[in-house]
């Protein structure tokens, strides 16, 4: 599906390294659960945030997309470490809109980073790779997104999210699909790709009977309440080894 991206720069350009962020999340993210206190003390994390500030040249659009996904996820963590939280209405305003970061020589907030930079790249599966530090978000991966395997990573993230019963459920008897609000908020992205939200989900759901019904748009859709509680240990938490 990434074939739509076009090469934007010379193939010999050096690709931005996400190794520092890989070091951080491989240590401090377990099955989507984030150890924020540990990340706050991790020098590799703060070094990575610093490297994001300067302008980067992208080898191609796939490289660009992987860069922005990693940048978003890293900055979403920073918002929590800076004492912000999307759990309440005013918290969301502060977390997504008021908090600004320097990334790729731009000053930008998380909302604009997602809506003005990432979504226009035309890849709907990014909605299952981006994590905004909340329980109902797609689980934060403990692997950075890389251009050379981005297709496989996005496929995996999409399959995992859609088939997670805590995020999406399908009742064949009543033909009711209980879906994540992500499919409501970003409906246009899925419609542009597959015609309908149900058609998009049908491509990834593993139950053949559910997939066939979705492909025929047979389900009534109801959206599940989104859980905005933190997806990990709060940054102010004192762990046992600190007592």
PLM region spans:
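N-terminal signal peptide c-region/cleavage motif recognized by signal peptidases
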Residues: 4-6
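Interaction/scaffold regions that mediate signaling and macromolecular assembly across diverse proteins
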Residues: 11-243
């Amino acid at each position: 599906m990434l074939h739509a991206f076009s090469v934007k720069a010379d193939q010999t350009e050096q690709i931005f390294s996400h190794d520092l962020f890989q070091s951080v999340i491989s240590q401090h993210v377990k099955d989507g659960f984030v150890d924020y206190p540990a990340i706050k003390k991790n020098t590799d994390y703060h070094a990575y945030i610093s490297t994001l500030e300067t302008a980067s040249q992208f080898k191609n659009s796939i490289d660009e997309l992987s860069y922005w996904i990693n940048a978003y996820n890293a900055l979403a963590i920073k918002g929590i470490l800076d004492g912000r939280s999307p759990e309440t209405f005013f918290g969301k305003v502060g977390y997504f809109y008021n908090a600004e970061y320097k990334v790729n020589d731009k000053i930008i907030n998380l909302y604009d980073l997602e809506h003005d930079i990432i979504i226009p790249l035309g890849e709907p599966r990014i909605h299952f790779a981006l994590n905004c530090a909340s329980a109902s978000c797609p689980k934060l991966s403990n692997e950075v997104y890389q251009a050379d395997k981005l297709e496989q990573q996005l496929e995996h993230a999409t399959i995992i999210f859609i088939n997670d019963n805590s995020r999406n459920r399908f009742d064949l008897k009543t033909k009711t699909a209980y879906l994540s609000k992500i499919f409501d908020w970003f409906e246009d992205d899925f419609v542009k790709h597959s015609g309908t939200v149900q058609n998009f989900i049908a491509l990834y759901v593993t139950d053949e009977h559910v997939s066939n019904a979705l492909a025929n748009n047979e389900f009534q859709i109801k959206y599940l309440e989104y859980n905005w509680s933190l997806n990990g240990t709060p940054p102010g938490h004192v762990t046992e080894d600190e007592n």
